[in-house]
UniProtKB/Swiss-Prot annotation:
It is an enzyme of class 2 (transferase). This is Protein-L-isoaspartate O-methyltransferase. Belongs to the methyltransferase superfamily. L-isoaspartyl/D-aspartyl protein methyltransferase family. Its EC number is 2.1.1.77. The gene is pcm. Catalyzes the methyl esterification of L-isoaspartyl residues in peptides and proteins that result from spontaneous decomposition of normal L-aspartyl and L-asparaginyl residues. It plays a role in the repair and/or degradation of damaged proteins. Coiled coil: none annotated. It catalyses: [protein]-L-isoaspartate + S-adenosyl-L-methionine = [protein]-L-isoaspartate alpha-methyl ester + S-adenosyl-L-homocysteine. Keywords: Cytoplasm, Methyltransferase, S-adenosyl-L-methionine, Transferase. It comes from Methylobacillus flagellatus (strain ATCC 51484 / DSM 6875 / VKM B-1610 / KT). PROSITE patterns: PCMT. It comes from the Bacteria. One of its GO terms (biological process) is protein repair.
Amino acid sequence: MSSAALSGIGMTSQRTRERMLRRLSEKGIKDEVVLAALGAIPRHIFVDEALSSRAYEDGSLPIGFGQTISQPYIVARMTEILRNGGPLGKVLEIGTGCGYQTAVLSKVSKEVYSVERIRPLLMKARGHLRELRLANIKLKHADGTMGLPELAPFDGIMVTAAARHIPQELLEQLAVGGRMVIPVGTEEQILYLVEHLKTASGSEYRQSKLEAVKFVPLLGGTN
């Protein structure tokens, strides 16, 4: 892809991206590192060309296979929660999708491991991420509900689809001191923060309800 396509022209220009960042700030995103990450990633390359003029609007867009690219606000919000004002080491993302959230995470993390169950989506995401030359990302075609136990523990886990309940398999892969952000629910969904806290007798998980959200469902298996 040409440098012009990556930087964007017209509706996909840097100026349009900056307007998106101002809107995110107005909606309460305070972490400058997160805002810089969203400003550095060209969202328009992750959507179909026919939708590129809407890439920097604060809304989700279809990416095929019944999946969507999350609205910029929720990408920023979940990244801000996961970061918690500090650097991130090893992060697991469940649901690569088109790769946009993955790319944002790569800007605020040392390592990002991302799992996607739909192979064609994964292949498309891999192409986008290669264009951006992001070297700290590893993608895997696998059942995201199982995580990546062979690479655990993770300092942060982000789930980008709504689970019926918080999977025990993912809890067990969260490092002590780590944080997981996950939407939970079916018709009504709530974004949860799960913290793995050290205690005098070992460790415990603390769950906090954050806000209402709307995601595609988290499904098991692969295709």
